[in-house]
C-alpha cells in the first residue's frame, strides 16, 4: 500500500487509545456475540492493526459491520468451515457464512503449507464475508518468507465503465514481497475502485468532500442513517469515469478479481449483490496465495536486486514540492511506529458508535 502522508494525518476530534486496550475491548465485544476466544482475538488484531497502520477505513470503523451482521445471523459466529485440496497446490475452503477474517486466516495457512512443500499454494474461499484489509494477509505470508497474494470480491459498490449501477465490489488486491533483512519490503494493497468504500465514508464523517473521481457524478455521495455510504452513490473504478483516464482498466481488474474469487470458488454473483445491504449472507469470496521466493533464484539474490531497484527509484527526479518518493508500504510502517508509541487515533464519531455497542453488549467502553 502507499498513501503518502495520509497515513500520518489525524482527525482533529480524535482520542488516542493504546493498542492493547483497543484489542481487548474489541475482542470482548465479539466474544459476547459467541465468537470463540481465538477468533475474537484475531478479529481484534486485524481491525485495530488497520488503525495502527493508518488505514482508518478498515479499522475500528468496521466493527459495527460485523456486529450488526452477527446480530442478524447473516454472519455465523461458529461456522462449519470445510477445506479440500484437489491438487497439491490448490484448495477450496468453504467458510460457512462465517467471519471472513477467520476464513482468510485458515486459507492463508493452508496456502503457505502447500508452498512449503511444493513451491506455491493457492486457496479460494467461498461463502465468506469481509476479510479486513487485504494487505494483512499478504503480509502474513511475507513475514513467513513467502511472496504473499490476497484478493477479495465484495458486495456491489462500483459501477462498471459506461454503467451507473453499483454492481461490482471494490475488489482489493494485495501483494507483499520480503526484502533484505533490515531493508525494505514491498507491500502493495489497493482497491480496484479509485478508493475503498471506507475512505469515502471516512471523508464524509470528517466533513471533507470526496475528491472528484471517487464517486460517480449521478448522485452526490452521502451517508445513510447508519453512517454507511448510500447505495445510490456508486464508486468509480480505478481510473475514473469512461475510458479517457483508464477507467476501463480498473473495471477490468475488478472483474478479474470477481472471477478469481467468485466464479472459481462457486460463490454466486447475484447473492453477493443482494448481500451488500446486510440483510442476507454477504456471499463473498477470497483468493489467498503463497509463493516461495527461492523457487526462482536464491532468495538473497532476489532481495539484493529488489533493494537496488528501490534505490534507483528513490534517487530518481522528484515532482516539484516533493521531498521523497515512497516505496509501497513505507507510509504505513511509519504510521505504525508512531501509533504504537502514542496510541491509535479514533475519531469521536467512531467512538460514539463503539460506545453504543459497548452498552448494548455489556462490555467496557473505549477509554477517554
Regions from the PLM with identified roles:
Residues 2-25, 259, 264, 269-368:
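Catalytic-core signal marking the mid-to-C-terminal active-site face
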Residues 2-19, 23-43, 48-49, 56-74, ...:
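Acidic, glycine/proline-rich low-complexity segments that act as flexible tails and inter-domain linkers
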Residues 58-112:
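Active-site cofactor/substrate anionic-group-binding motifs, chiefly glycine-
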Residues 84-90, 94, 106-121, 218-239:
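Residues forming anionic-ligand binding surfaces in small-molecule and nucleic-acid pockets
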Residues 90-180:
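A generic, well-ordered mixed alpha/beta core segment in the N-terminal half of proteins
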Residues 158-230:
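Phosphate/diphosphate-binding glycine-rich loops and adjacent basic-rich segments that engage nucleotide
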Amino acid at each position: 500500500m502507499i498513501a503518502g502522508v495520509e497515513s500520518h494525518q489525524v482527525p482533529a476530534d480524535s482520542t488516542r487509545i493504546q493498542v492493547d486496550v483497543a484489542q481487548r475491548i474489541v475482542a470482548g465485544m465479539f466474544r459476547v456475540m459467541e465468537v470463540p476466544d481465538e477468533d475474537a482475538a484475531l478479529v481484534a488484531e486485524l481491525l485495530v492493526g488497520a488503525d495502527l497502520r493508518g488505514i482508518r477505513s478498515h479499522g475500528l470503523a468496521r466493527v459495527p459491520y460485523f456486529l450488526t451482521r452477527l446480530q442478524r445471523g447473516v454472519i455465523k459466529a461458529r461456522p462449519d468451515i470445510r477445506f479440500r485440496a484437489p491438487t497439491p497446490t490448490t484448495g477450496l475452503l468453504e467458510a460457512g457464512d462465517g467471519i471472513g477474517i477467520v476464513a482468510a486466516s485458515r486459507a492463508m495457512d493452508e496456502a503457505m503449507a502447500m508452498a512449503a512443500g511444493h513451491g506455491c499454494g493457492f486457496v479460494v474461499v467461498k461463502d465468506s464475508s469481509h476479510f479486513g484489509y487485504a494487505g494483512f494477509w499478504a503480509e502474513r505470508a511475507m513475514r513467513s518468507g513467502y511472496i504473499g497474494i490476497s484478493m477479495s470480491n465484495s458486495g456491489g459498490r462500483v459501477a462498471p465503465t459506461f454503467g451507473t449501477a453499483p454492481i461490482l465490489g471494490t475488489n482489493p488486491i494485495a501483494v507483499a514481497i520480503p526484502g533484505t533483512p533490515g531493508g525494505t519490503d514491498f507491500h502493495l494493497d489497493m482497491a480496484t475502485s479509485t478508493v475503498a468504500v471506507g475512505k469515502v465514508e471516512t471523508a464524509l464523517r470528517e466533513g471533507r468532500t470526496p475528491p472528484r473521481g471517487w464517486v460517480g457524478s449521478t448522485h452526490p455521495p452521502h451517508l445513510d442513517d447508519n453512517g454507511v455510504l448510500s447505495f445510490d452513490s456508486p464508486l468509480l473504478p480505478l481510473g475514473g469515469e469512461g475510458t479517457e483516464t483508464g477507467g476501463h482498466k480498473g473495471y477490468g481488474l475488478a472483474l478479474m478479481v470477481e472471477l478469481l474469487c467468485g466464479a472459481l470458488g462457486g460463490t454466486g454473483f447475484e447473492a453477493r449483490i443482494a448481500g451488500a445491504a446486510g440483510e442476507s449472507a454477504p456471499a463473498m469470496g477470497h483468493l489467498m496465495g503463497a509463493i516461495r521466493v527461492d523457487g526462482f533464484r536464491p532468495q538473497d539474490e532476489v532481495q539484493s536486486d529488489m533493494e537496488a531497484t528501490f534505490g534507483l527509484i528513490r534517487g530518481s527526479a522528484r515532482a516539484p514540492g516533493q521531498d521523497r518518493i515512497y516505496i509501497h508500504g513505507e507510509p504505513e510502517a511509519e504510521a505504525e511506529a508512531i501509533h504504537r508509541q502514542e496510541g491509535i487515533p479514533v475519531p469521536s464519531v467512531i467512538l460514539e458508535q463503539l460506545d453504543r455497542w459497548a452498552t448494548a453488549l455489556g462490555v467496557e467502553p473505549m477509554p477517554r
